[in-house]
Amino acid sequence: MPVTVPPSGIPEKIITGIFWIFLALAVCLVPALLILNQDVFLAASNYLQLAAAAIGAVAFCVAYFRSGRKKHFAWAAGAFGIWAAANAAWYVNVFLGLRAIVFPSLIDMGFLAFMFLLASAFQVALPRTRVNPKISLGILVLLLITPIAIFLAMGITASTLMTFLYFFFAAALIIIGLSHSLREHPFLFSGTLLYCIAFMVYPLREVLFPGIAWLNIIGPVVIASFSLTVIGFFREPAEKASG
């Protein structure tokens, strides 16, 4: 049974069309990073991220009620809604000149919650598949090498601990996705990988490279991630009977 919304809900083509536009805007933002003033770029990037997250949350909420309360839509709506709130708080603090206090902070819990809730949506929407335990262990070890190295170099602090949590949650999301046939759904798979990459780079930027402007490319990557994820949920998977 496709995970699209039935005829009485939001037309699938409208939802996917909106997020194809967001994806195109994300691509356009990449070269804009070299042209626009850093503050202008940051504002444009964050407004688009907020818009994509908020519209995604609304689309998933309506889809939840219009599709017989399928649970994966609720998990996805929660993920996008919490992320939008967290990013709004992040940008307000940066706008007020409080960039130094946004990492680590409670705001990070919203970004991490996105990964937890998205993993929950995958568990409901996608059929479970067997993954070689060595692959899962390899992913975990590979992704935790960097934060562990940071622990060894800088010690255990609030910042290094938060960095570890970002990498751990990213590894967990990828492993859970792979164990629920995520590779068979290229839009969802690509969106998930982009989000994980963005939010492994994010703590590294905050801890090690706060002055490097080109790392603001995280913004377009997140917009692309959201776009692919929404398109994937409305086009690709077949929900489990229990959903």
Model region roles, listed by residue range:
Residues 2-243:
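Polytopic alpha-helical membrane-helix bundles and their juxtamembrane interface segments
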